[in-house]
Amino acid sequence: MSRILMSQLTHPQRVRLLYKTILRLHRGLPAELRALGDNYVRDEFRRHLKCNPMEAQLFMTEWARYASTITQQLGIRGKPKGELGEEIDPKTVEMLKDDQVVQLYELMLAAKGVEDAQGK
């Protein structure tokens, strides 16, 4: 069977392929991070089902970058880094919407296993 080029796939097929690839990569994470990551990815992909084309392009680019980063960090291609995650540039945080900052903060707390002030 010949390999299908990404350019031959429809947009929904590319989205599904990226989604499935990320979930497969998460199999290499510790169990608690895998569950957190899988839920987050599922929610984000659902949330962006009906976004405009410009947002969709940015969404796909950023998630493809995430997949590439986690591939390197898990050592699937090349030498493993031995650590997961990366620092977020303060300029990037400044560009986020308020709800995105809250979501990022909640994700950080969940990843560290810390409860917020509301006991969540």
Swiss-Prot record:
The keyword Signal does not apply. Transmembrane segments: none annotated. This is Succinate dehydrogenase assembly factor 3, mitochondrial. The keyword Chaperone applies. It is found in: Mitochondrion matrix. Residues 1-36 form a transit peptide. Belongs to the complex I LYR family. SDHAF3 subfamily. Interacts with SdhB within an SdhA-SdhB subcomplex. Disruption phenotype: Reduces the SdhB protein level resulting in an approximate 50% reduction in SDH enzymatic activity. InterPro entries: SDHAF3/Sdh7. It holds the Pfam family Complex1_LYR_2. GO terms for cellular component: mitochondrial intermembrane space; mitochondrial matrix. CDD domains: Complex1_LYR_SDHAF3_LYRM10 (cd20270). One of its GO terms (biological process) is response to oxidative stress. Plays an essential role in the assembly of succinate dehydrogenase (SDH), an enzyme complex (also referred to as respiratory complex II) that is a component of both the tricarboxylic acid (TCA) cycle and the mitochondrial electron transport chain, and which couples the oxidation of succinate to fumarate with the reduction of ubiquinone (coenzyme Q) to ubiquinol. Promotes maturation of the iron-sulfur protein subunit SdhB of the SDH catalytic dimer, protecting it from the deleterious effects of oxidants. Keywords: Chaperone, Mitochondrion, Transit peptide.
